[in-house]
Amino acid sequence: MNYIKRNLENVVRQVTREYPVLLVTGPRQVGKTTMLQKLMEGTERGYVTLDDLNERYIAKTDPELFLQLHKPPVLIDEVQYAPELFTYIKINADKNHEPGAFWLTGSQVFKLMQGVQESLAGRVAVLSLTSLSQAEISGGTMKPFTVDLEDLSERQKEREQADTREIFERIYQGSMPAIVSGINSNSQLFYSSYLSTYIERDVRELSDAIDSLKFLRFITAVAARCGQMVNAAEIARDADINQTQAKDWLTILETLGIIFYLHPYSNNLLKRLVKTPKLYFYDTGLVCYLTKWSSAETLECGAMNGAILENYVVAEIRKTYLNCGKEPYLYYYRDKDAREIDIVLEHDGILNPIEIKKTANPGTELVKVFELLDKASTPRAKGAVICMKPGLSAIDRDNYIVPVWMI
């Protein structure tokens, strides 16, 4: 297997020179450990995983002894299993002031962050690793996605061009490293195993009373609503659980890095806006598996093609920021009259409205809705329609046409 270089590597090197502690979060099997072990090659950094029950026991019951056994520089894998370590890592960092002393990984984002914020504030750099991005798979320099003509032109030169069929093959295959690298050639078998391990292991770590079959029905109901506003009542009905359970289980999915939310854009000058977030999966391959699409071809022609394409584009844009160690300020716009903008990208004091469509020939009617942002206190800048057009183009002077493969 060839190692796929991760865009986050340069950020890891940078923060290792500046902070005593690095924490890389992200769901299981996205390559956190693989990336860090690759960067460790030729160094004296040690490695220990808390998946090892004996090591976990020592870390929880005698964290001081654990750090004597595993002296820095060290990589501690799955650190969420022993939050007792954080206080002792803080003591070590304050005493020795050694940049890069501790590399930590963890798969339970919110649970981890609570302990980190309480114990390691100011001493830790936190980075998020997701499944592979388009840029990592096909090559090209990673920069945060912007609706800037110079940036878009540069992307057009670097990225690997793909037609509609190829885009839907990427969407259907998913972006987990084991599938993309060829370790697991059967994506259906991979996701079946992934879900079983995920539900029986990680979910039960957070809630041991969960019924596995009910949770599988639940996550399937959630996948069927990717790209939609969250409706816990509908999800609960389809999964045969109560609404409180549905909300709690959505929190578990977010905690484990399976889903994320796009919150509605709000501004004190904009009135009558909805307040409900939209829900997306980090990996569209998992969505396709859960919603039982048999091939990329059937998905491309199916009823969910628009929703899953939107999920793919939003997730890919989000990755371009996370892979540079930056927070993505992505929102969506929807008012009480159901007028909607798929993405509102806020950066550098401007707003870029973005629509996502399966068409290859978007028209001016798609960008009329962008004018709704003109009432906001933050100025509206260039807009874009991300679609299946083969190359970079424009609808007019203020709105570009951007192929999906250029993200």
Spans of features found by a protein language model:
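Interdomain hinge/linker elements that couple catalytic modules in large macromolecular machines
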Residues: 2, 135, 139-318, 322, ...
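A short beta-strand-to-loop transition that corresponds to the Sensor-1 phosphate-sensing loop
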Residues: 105-109, 115, 130-132, 387-389
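Conserved catalytic/switch belt of AAA+ P-loop NTPases
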Residues: 86-110, 117-119
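Conserved P-loop NTPase "ATPase switch" module shared by AAA+ and STAND
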Residues: 70-85
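Short glycine-rich substrate-engagement loop in P-loop NTPases that contacts/grips substrate
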Residues: 45-73
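A cross-kingdom feature that marks ATP-driven nucleic-acid transaction machinery
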Residues: 1-27, 33-46, 50, 70, ...
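Short regulatory helix/loop adjacent to the ATP-binding pocket of P-loop NTPases
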Residues: 110-126, 138-143
